[in-house]
Amino acid sequence: MELQEVLHMNGGESDTSYAKNSSYNQLVLTKVKPVLEQCIRELLRANLPNINKCIKVADLGCASGPNTLLTVRDIVQSIDKVGQEEKNELEHPTIQIFLNDLFQNDFNSVFKLLPSFYRKLEKENGRKIGSCLISAMPGSFYGRLFPEESMHFLHSCYSVHWLSQVPSGLVTELGISANKGIIYSSKASPPPVQKAYLDQFTKDFTTFLRIHSEELLSRGRMLLTCICKGDESDGLNTIDLLERAINDLVVEGLLEEEKLDSFNLPLYTPSLEVVKCIVEEEGSFEILYLETFKVRYDAGFSIDDDYQVRSLFQVYCDEHVKAAYVTFFFRAVFEPILASHFGEAIMPDLFHRFAKNAAKALRLGNGFYNSLIISLAKKPEKSDV
């Protein structure tokens, strides 16, 4: 099965769907929003062609469910807020938003929400229906999506850490896994494996920057958020917890060792330095903002979080209940690719073990997702300076 066919979130509205298990991502969007507003402010002040009439925006790797439209809402609100603050003709330009993800993404779950979303925009923002136009643009964001110099603003949250393919060179000349017992580029991976993943990310991210710089107008903006490398003190990340669960199944004879050794996630968590270096070497963009932040696995659930997102369960919960929350979110993201390799039948047992590992991490006070935000401006052509 082709990677693009399984690299998507759980669709629909079941208990394990992304639509029902994405409050963590809502929290991340809350963290990103101040940077988004500043990015929009700089964009509108740049006075790009046709921006007074229609601002063209794309969300790359939009996923599905309510979070997709939360991103759209934040972008629209930022544009309207800045327009009001600037007191100029940009107060209510038409906004054309393209939602991009791979072909297997559940776009229908988003489209079903549009009528109520448009009504809410009209009620809360004073935007008449028709002043915000939302459509889908399916396809890989590692390829061309839009005409040259046609877009004002590109946004992507929690997508660019996904690679276009599993790196080559993960099998030795003897046909043995070079990353035996490990499912991604971790601290325990041999140096050649770490280099293979870094090389693939460098190739993919360079392609991403080059292609989308061609689609952006001169001085257009791009805002990216992705998972990044953490600190030694953070403990195991969720991929490590998954890896332990799979290894336990192998040890107990419930899963063939070959299945584990032949599985490598097409995912890479870069460091801030790596991202900065790639952007500078590719050369199309100026870095306006670059920072990292960390959030606990169970953020978005606990009533102790210092964020706007709050749990539906306003009671004290132990680590097992919180671990179940973490597991549902993780399963919504990773189940399609895991089930395609290991089989549907073993998924309940696998995620049960994952939940136990997550509970241990939370009990020890460990368990963080590390994220990176980078705001970019396309460098003007010499003739535009």
Swiss-Prot record:
Cofactors demanded by this protein: Mg(2+)
One GO-annotated biological process of the protein: methylation
InterPro entries from the UniProt entry: MeTrfase_7 (IPR005299), MeTrfase_capping (IPR042086), SAM-dependent_MTases_sf (IPR029063)
Residue sites binding caffeine per the record: Y158, H161, W162, T238, Y369
Pathway noted in the entry: Alkaloid biosynthesis
E.C. number(s) listed in UniProt: 2.1.1.-
Residues bound to Mg(2+): N179, D261, F263, N264
Entry GO MF terms: metal ion binding; methyltransferase activity
Top enzyme class: transferase
TM spans (from-to): none
Keyword Metal-binding: yes
Signal peptide start and end residues: none
Site feature (Involved in substrate discrimination) residues: H155, L267, E344
Binding site for S-adenosyl-L-homocysteine: Y18, C62, N67, D101, L102, S140, F141, C157
Cofactor note (record): Binds 1 Mg(2+) ion per subunit.
Keywords for the protein's UniProt record, in alphabetical order: Magnesium, Metal-binding, Methyltransferase, Transferase
Family to which this protein belongs: Belongs to the methyltransferase superfamily. Type-7 methyltransferase family.
Job description of the protein: May be involved in the biosynthesis of caffeine.
Protein name as it appears in the record: Probable caffeine synthase MTL3
Organismal lineage: Eukaryota, Viridiplantae, Streptophyta, Embryophyta, Tracheophyta
